[in-house]
Amino acid sequence: MSNQEFAQRWQGVMIDSYGTPGLSFVRGEGSTLWDADGTAYTDFVSGLAVNALGHAHPAVVGAVSRQIASLGHISNFYSAEPTITLAERLIELFGRPGRVFFCNSGAEANETAFKIGRLTGRSRIVAAQSGFHGRTMGSLALTGQPAKREPFLPLPGDVTHVPYGDAEALRAAVTEDTAMVILEPIQGESGVVVPPKGYLRAAREITEATGTLLVLDEVQTGIGRTGHWFAAQAEGVEADVVTLAKGLGGGLPLGAAVAFGRAAELMTPGHHASTFGGNPVSCARTRVLDTIAADGLLDRVKQLGSAPDEWSVRDAAAIRWSPMSGAGLMLGIVLNEPLAPQVQLAAQKAGFLVNVPAPDVVRLIPPLVIEETEVDAFLQALPGLLDAVHERDREGQTGE
């Protein structure tokens, strides 16, 4: 069956919330995907920063296969070893006592944080403009992107959005009535936006001064994506709640809210639940964490993430784009013109899958196991792709 045939079947039965996909994939291995037509692509999207170990990693396949063969779903009326082990491993990575609530996604993890904030007895919440925390009604209320919010108004209330990266604006908005501040260490969905150095530390100081919880949404930045287990570790910032998903499950639905100090004690039985949260099969992906550690992937991510930045500075003038933004293997190619969708299509035709979070940004979030040769191949092809897109755009404007 071809890509076109899959697209026709999709159109017949799926709600049109994504648009009709042009590609249908049938197999993956490492950083390579094969579509229904047999074409191979180097994957710089990794399921939107989900497949930390790439596709069909033997350690993950083995762990999940063994777990599903012995115990699948049991509900949270009971406990299972994989769930407890993963929670213990996360607390170990944070290096301080805490408690974990497992769920299925980043949006659900942020809904959990929302509830923890309200359990302080305060109601006001401060979030960032252009921030993204999910599409459920509560997480959408936290999201600072009007285009995503407006079709669903009114949303759960008392959320104030302030400019991202502006510590003084944050300071002015946070008072002793503020329940929590929620921020991304790097804004992913708005274009891989990195705040000024010291911003997260300032947020920690502001929230501590007012008794406000600091929630860091590490759904995209966590689990090694930036070269640290958690991006905030680069600044030594410790939040009251950290939300996780994407790379945590390594390909299966898994999210978590990890709470510390008083935030870890606010929820009691009956306050919250998730039917599939902590599913033993999803939690068997502890092997993701073990493999990242055993294979030295954090250092490798830092090294791979630095190479394209040096390259972009060297060749920026020739190919009309600014130096890459981001950290580790969460990178944004910031174009000087809003041509990112055209670049995405050109890259796809050349055998590379990339993502477009903004009209002028091409996002690279490949598996952490991507080979250096695969990165080099993309970087070698990129100037030609950009030149071709720019030339076609120029011809379209002049009518040539």
UniProtKB/Swiss-Prot annotation:
One example of the protein's molecular function in GO is:
pyridoxal phosphate binding
Which chemical reaction does it catalyze? N(2)-acetyl-L-ornithine + 2-oxoglutarate = N-acetyl-L-glutamate 5-semialdehyde + L-glutamate
What does the record say about how the cofactor binds? Binds 1 pyridoxal phosphate per subunit.
Q: Which cofactor does it need?
A: pyridoxal 5'-phosphate
Q: Which residues bind N(2)-acetyl-L-ornithine?
A: 135, 274
What keyword terms does UniProt attach to this protein? Amino-acid biosynthesis, Aminotransferase, Arginine biosynthesis, Cytoplasm, Pyridoxal phosphate, Transferase
Q: Which domain of life is it from?
A: Bacteria
Question: Which family is this sequence assigned to?
Answer: Belongs to the class-III pyridoxal-phosphate-dependent aminotransferase family. ArgD subfamily.
EC category name: transferase
Gene from which the chain derives? argD
Q: What is this protein called?
A: Acetylornithine aminotransferase
